[in-house]
């Protein structure tokens, strides 16, 4: 669960990534609360555990020019699990890293910065390369358009319907609670 959450954090951070012709978004467009509402992966852990997963909440804050902090709240069998992770920019445009447990890179496939973002993450750990796609939303209820974009991009990356999970909303924990 921790590695999944850390990968989610890195993906959120890379919402700063833009296409070459696009303008870098204002920090206020990236900062704030996000909900991880859908996932796609072919990893054994995901395929085994996806039915138990619920929506994760995250809050992005800027610590400086090159650092972001992400606070998380995720329901677990032992209650609400909360943690924070700090990410640093690399020399590559639009790339951020967190390397405590594994090498992680992310790519923003599609976003409007206002309501949704589709992220593709790659993680290398113990010589294995793992991939996961995520749909982030500013609200618990993702728009049908954003969900359609996510599903289309998942198919393009060869994820089957069995490899996609729309995460149920949860009220157990929030990044807003102390």
From Swiss-Prot:
Cystine pairs: 80-173
Keyword vocabulary terms for this entry: Antibiotic, Antimicrobial, Disulfide bond, Immunity, Innate immunity, Iron, Secreted, Signal, Transport
Signal peptide: 1-20
Induction: Down-regulated by dietary stress. Significantly decreased expression between days 0 to 5 in egg whites of eggs laid by corticosterone-fed hens (at protein level). Decreased expression at day 14 in the magnum of the oviduct in the corticosterone-fed laying hens.
Residues binding enterobactin: 43, 104, 123, 134
CDD domains found in the cross-reference section: lipocalin_Ex-FABP-like
Binding-site residues for 1-tetradecanoyl-sn-glycerol 3-phosphate, renumbered to this chain: 72, 104, 134-136
Highest rank taxon of the organism: Eukaryota
Tissue localization of expression: Expressed in egg white (at protein level). Expressed in the magnum of the oviduct (at protein level). Preferentially synthesized in nonproliferating cells.
Pfam families noted in UniProt: Lipocalin
InterPro entries: Calycin, Lipocalin, Lipocalin_CS, Lipocln_cytosolic_FA-bd_dom
Subcellular location as annotated: Secreted
The record's account of how the chain is modified after translation: Does not seem to be glycosylated.
GO MF: arachidonate binding; fatty acid binding; linoleic acid binding; oleic acid binding; stearic acid binding
GO CC terms, sorted: extracellular space
Biological processes annotated in GO: acute-phase response; apoptotic process; cell differentiation; cell population proliferation; cellular response to linoleic acid; chondrocyte differentiation; chondrocyte hypertrophy; defense response to bacterium
PANTHER family reported in the protein's UniProt record: LIPOCALIN, LIPOCALIN-LIKE 1 PROTEIN
Subunit structure: Monomer.
Further facts: Developmentally regulated in chick embryo.
UniProt similarity note: Belongs to the calycin superfamily. Lipocalin family.
Protein name according to UniProt: Extracellular fatty acid-binding protein
């Amino acid at each position: 669960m921790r590695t999944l959450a850390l990968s989610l954090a890195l993906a959120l951070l890379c919402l700063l990534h833009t296409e070459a012709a696009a303008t870098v978004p204002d920090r206020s467009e990236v900062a704030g609360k996000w909900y991880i509402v859908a996932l796609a992966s072919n990893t054994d852990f995901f395929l085994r555990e996806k039915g138990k997963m619920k929506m994760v909440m995250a809050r992005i804050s800027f610590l400086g020019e090159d650092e972001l902090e992400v606070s998380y709240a995720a329901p677990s069998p032992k209650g609400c699990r909360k943690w924070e992770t700090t990410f640093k920019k690399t020399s590559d445009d639009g790339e951020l890293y967190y390397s405590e447990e594994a090498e992680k890179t992310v790519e923003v496939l599609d976003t409007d910065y206002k309501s949704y973002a589709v992220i593709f993450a790659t993680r290398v750990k113990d010589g294995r390369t793992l991939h996961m796609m995520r749909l982030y939303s500013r609200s618990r209820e993702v728009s049908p358009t954003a969900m359609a974009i996510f599903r289309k991009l998942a198919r393009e990356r060869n994820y089957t319907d069995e490899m996609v999970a729309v995460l149920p909303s949860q009220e157990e924990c929030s990044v807003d609670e102390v």
